[in-house]
Each structure stands twice: as C-alpha cells, then as structure tokens.
Amino acid sequence: MERDMMINQIKQTAVRVLPKGSTLYLYGSRARGDYHSDSDWDLLLLLDKPKLTFKDYDYGYPFSELGWESNEEINTQVYSKKEWADYHFTPFYKNVEHDKIVLI
C-alpha cells in the first residue's frame, strides 16, 4: 500500500480507538524514508497515564488488524508517557526520538 495512504489509515484508526491524550509516533525505516516494499510499520503509542495495565496493550490490536487487512506488518509498542520518559537514556528511545513522525 502507498505510504501516505497507509499513514492516513493508521491516523484514522488512532482517532477512532485511542483514549484522549494519547500520542502515536511512526518510527524506523518508514519514518526515515529508507524503507523497502516489505518493510514493517513501527508505531510507538504513548498513553497519558502514570503506569500501564495489561488491558492497555489491547490498544495495539486495531493497528495489527489494519495490517492484516492491508497485507502490511504493523508493530505497536505501548508505553505510558511517564514510562517512556524514564527510558530517555536508552538507544531505543534515542533512535525513536531521532526518527519519529507524530501521527496524533
């Protein structure tokens, strides 16, 4: 699927299913622009709460479902905004912050 069309569908899904105050980033090769046709879509979902519950990980499911329907692989990492800020020293955090595109 065309990149802009897929980003649009991800945004529409996010607006439909995510709680208020959430932030969704696209990162990795799709954000940097050095992707290939079989590259996956890496999403980082930040929820506006101090700590996640097991149920919060379910917010990633609609994006996986969108991937199945679109014949694309979508991987969603879920963190609370506080937990994400606590990872500021990690290479993963630094890579995401460098590459990210804010979707919502």
Language model features with spans:
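Catalytic core of pol beta-like nucleotidyltransferases
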Residues: 1-25, 32-37, 47-104
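Short beta-strand->loop micro-motif that forms the acidic, two-metal-ion catalytic signature
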Residues: 42-46
